[in-house]
Curated annotation (Swiss-Prot):
Name assigned to this protein: Coiled-coil domain-containing protein 181
Function of the protein: Microtubule-binding protein that localizes to the microtubular manchette of elongating spermatids.
Residue ranges, annotated region (Disordered): 46-120, 241-367
Originating gene: CCDC181
GO cellular component, one term: cytoplasm
Subcellular location: Cytoplasm, Cytoskeleton; Cell projection, Cilium, Flagellum
Entry coiled-coil feature ranges: 335-375
Highest taxon, organism lineage: Eukaryota
Length: 509
């Protein structure tokens, strides 16, 4: 298996190398051919530019010289003789300046054309040679093995996902027919309350309801006509629900009355007395009776003042915002007085519960704050007592240390310290006396030499005083350390020598 894998890998590597070599060779050949063509074009442009420059120099030279005939005869004689001269015939008159210039330009143009044709032929010949060489190389190459695995692969199906064609439009037609049937059921509907104050009229043409752009219907309200949206009326609960839009128009349908199930603390309310009697006329003329009640969420709907003439003339609803007022007559979608009272009682109970909850929260927060203050004060008092106790213990220890030092002091050591202090005091007195004498002698010193000598002596004296002070400080610290060490040793000996029974000792107090 390993040998097969090795052979496959070698073949794939050889194939990749061949493919890369072929690509590199083709790219190099294309680059060489492009470079050769560009070089030939550049050479052509250079030759043309040189010829034009020569023509310009010749023209300037002819203009500068005063004798144009002689200069033209000297410069252009060989070319003109080659092109214009006839054997056995001598020129009758000298050629004018304009004729000589024209003949010279024509000869130049012809020479340029000849050069361009020769260069074009050379380029064509070079390209043909390259093509022949490439064909020979392709013929000499080995035929490509179609069985070997290729690096570049293409799918059999370039398109992975094909979008199916559009389905038949019968489904859309059925959908629109169902909607028309549904509107046909509601084509002629009269909705009114028990008192006959409000009517809703739906017009029907040819037994079917055509979809309007706005889906509006004509509504009679308090003797006024309005164009309202069908969706708004359906959402407010005017229209009865339709069980099946695809059912036949001749089948009578009856809608059972709904009772308002809004309850307070789990009890049902009374059924509302206001009902809607709706009668629909099908295309054959058979009446269909619907009995419906107002929806559960019945709210007071303000009626807007609408100009009836404009609505009749234009056939569209007036969308201008106008002052709204509540109808004095109790409509089918208004709350009854009992329901209003119950709703008011519910709102009062909710507000009362909300106020009690807020009051309870405020009291709890105050209680928590009071407890936190008490706990903080107790902690602070405890910390103060601890600090005072620590200070008292530290002061007692310091007093004991001072007493132990005085009791355990060596008399010889004390005498030495006293003697040293007296010696230091005497030294200080002598130094002060010397300073006083020097100050008195300064008045008698004359010149700069005496002043400099006095200043140097003063500096030397200051240095010595400073060194003496440092030495005294060192000696004092050394003595204090020795005393502390000796006192600790004595305490240790006393503690070890003293026979102590087993007893409880409170180290913190």
């Amino acid at each position: 298996m390993n040998e097969n894998k090795d052979t496959d890998s070698k073949k794939s590597e050889e194939y990749e190398d061949d493919f890369e070599k072929d690509l590199e060779w083709l790219i190099n050949e294309n680059e060489k051919s492009d470079a050769s063509i560009i070089e030939m074009a550049c050479e052509k442009e250079e030759n043309i530019n040189q010829d034009l420059k020569e023509n310009e120099t010749v023209m300037e030279h002819t203009k500068r010289h005063s004798d144009p005939d002689k200069s033209l005869q000297d410069e252009v004689s060989p070319r003109r003789n080659d092109i214009i001269s006839v054997p056995g015939i001598q020129p009758l008159d000298p050629i004018s300046d304009s004729d000589s210039e024209n003949s010279f330009q024509e000869s130049k143009l012809e020479s340029q054309k000849d050069l361009e044709e020769e260069e074009d032929e050379e380029v064509r010949r070079y390209i043909m040679e390259k093509i022949v060489q490439a064909n020979k190389l392709l013929q000499n190459q080995e035929p490509v093995n179609d069985k070997r695995e290729r690096k570049l692969k293409f799918k059999d199906q370039l398109v992975d996902l094909e979008v199916p064609p559009l389905e038949d439009t019968t489904t859309f037609k059925n959908y629109f027919e169902n909607e028309r049937n549904m509107f046909g059921k509601l084509s002629q509907l009269c909705i009114s309350n028990d008192f006959g104050q409000e009517d809703v009229l739906l017009s029907l043409t040819n037994g079917s309801c055509e979809e309007n752009k706005d889906r509006t219907i004509l509504v009679e309200r308090d003797g006024k006509f309005e164009l309202l949206n069908l969706q708004d009326i359906a959402s407010q609960g005017f229209l009865p629900p339709i069980n099946n839009a695809n059912s036949t128009e001749n089948d009578p349908q009856q809608l059972l009355p709904r009772s308002s199930n809004s309850s307070v603390s789990g009890t049902k309310k009374e059924d509302s007395t206001a009902k809607i009697h709706a009668v629909t006329h099908s295309s054959t003329g058979e009446p269909l009776a619907y009995i419906a009640q107002p929806p559960l969420n019945r709210k007071t709907c303000p009626s807007s003042a609408v100009n009836s003439d404009r609505s009749k003339g234009n056939g569209k609803s007036n969308h201008r915002t106008q002052s709204a007022h509540i109808s004095p007559v109790t409509s089918t979608y208004c709350l009854s007085p009992r329901q209003k009272e119950l709703q008011k009682q519910l709102e009062e109970k909710r507000e009362k519960l909300k106020r009690e909850e807020e009051r309870r929260k405020i009291e709890e927060e105050k209680e928590k704050k009071r407890e936190n203050d008490i706990v903080f004060k107790a902690w602070l008092q405890k910390k103060r007592e601890q600090v005072l106790e620590m200070r008292r213990i530290q002061r007692a220890k310091e007093i004991e240390d001072m007493n132990s030092r005085q009791e355990n002091r060596d008399p010889q050591q004390a005498f030495r310290l006293w003697l040293k202090k007296k010696h230091e005091e005497q030294m200080k007195e002598r130094q002060t006396e010397e300073l006083r004498k020097q100050e008195e002698c300064l008045f008698f010193l004359k010149g700069t030499e005496g002043r400099e000598r006095a200043f140097k002596q003063w500096l030397r004296r200051k240095r010595m005083e400073k060194m003496a002070e440092q030495q005294a400080v060192r000696e004092r610290t050394r003595q204090l350390r020795l005393e502390a060490k000796r006192s600790k040793q004595l305490q240790h000996h006393l503690y070890m020598s003293e026979a102590k029974p087993f007893r409880f000792t409170d180290h913190y107090n």
